[in-house]
Regions:
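Extracellular calcium-associated, cysteine-rich motifs in secreted modular proteins
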Residues: 1-247
Length: 247
């Protein structure tokens, strides 16, 4: 019996001779690039299967566009060039804002193994994309924090409760106001504008502890507020036995 597949690559000899361009029916790897002409792997010879069996510089064509992956500027054919694509081999995703390996969005089915999983917090600031996109229209609008930017107002304080090294510190009480970030007393007025940051009814310029609502005076200057200090004037006589505790 005549062997109809002399090189054992699962391509009939007649197929190889009549293909355009023709492959070598006596050589399972016509172009010698390590990938077999046909749909079979031959141990110690070549792996299946070469999308370009007569071109030694190409073997894969991930998106099936006729351009080999080695020269294709958009390997996965998703419309985003490889250099700008965080997932150049998977057409379902292209952007990973926070660099955590999870794509901002997934369109269609992921071809990765294991499959990609969509990131629910694209900027990794501790606020989910849904929380930031209040009106749910998928775009960054006035009155919303940016789901692709952990510090929307660029004041150095993060929108959410996560500190991101070299980017921002958690957490901004006013994520849309670059001039405010803290609100010590929670009165809705930022510390930069508030004249009584701790809300103890002592103005900051007269308060020795402007961020501590339990203290405002330190008579002896020892760093302990009078309310906690048991010897306010530091005369070595306890306040409860001192007729002049502030003198």
């Amino acid at each position: 019996n005549l062997d109809s597949d002399d090189d054992g690559d699962l391509l009939k000899d007649d197929e190889e001779k009549s293909s355009d361009p023709a492959t070598d029916s006596l050589n399972p790897d016509t172009d010698g690039d390590g990938f077999c002409d046909g749909p079979v792997t031959i141990a110690d010879v070549c792996e299946a299967i070469d999308a370009f069996p007569t071109d030694e510089t190409e073997w894969f064509d991930s998106d099936g566009d006729g351009i080999g992956d080695n020269s294709d500027p958009d390997v996965d054919g998703d419309g985003v060039d490889n250099e700008q694509d965080d997932f150049p081999d998977d057409p379902s995703a292209s952007k990973d804002t926070d660099g955590d390996g999870m794509p901002d969005t997934i369109t269609g089915n992921s071809t990765s193994d294991p499959a990609l999983v969509e990131d629910l917090d694209d900027d990794n600031d501790g606020l989910t994309d849904i929380e930031e996109d209040v009106n749910g229209n998928g775009t960054f609008d006035d009155g919303e924090t940016n789901s692709l930017d952990p510090d929307t107002d660029d004041d150095g304080y993060c929108d959410g409760n996560v500190t991101i090294v070299d980017v921002c510190v958690a957490v901004d009480a006013f994520p849309l106001d670059s001039s405010e970030w803290l609100d010590t007393d929670g009165d809705g007025v930022g510390n930069e504008a508030d004249t009584d940051d701790d809300g103890d009814n002592v103005q900051d310029d007269a308060d020795q502890f402007p961020k501590n609502p339990d203290e405002s005076l330190d008579t002896d200057g020892d760093g302990i507020g009078n309310n906690a200090d048991d010897d306010d004037d530091n005369d070595e006589r306890k306040d409860d036995n001192d007729a002049f505790p502030l003198d």
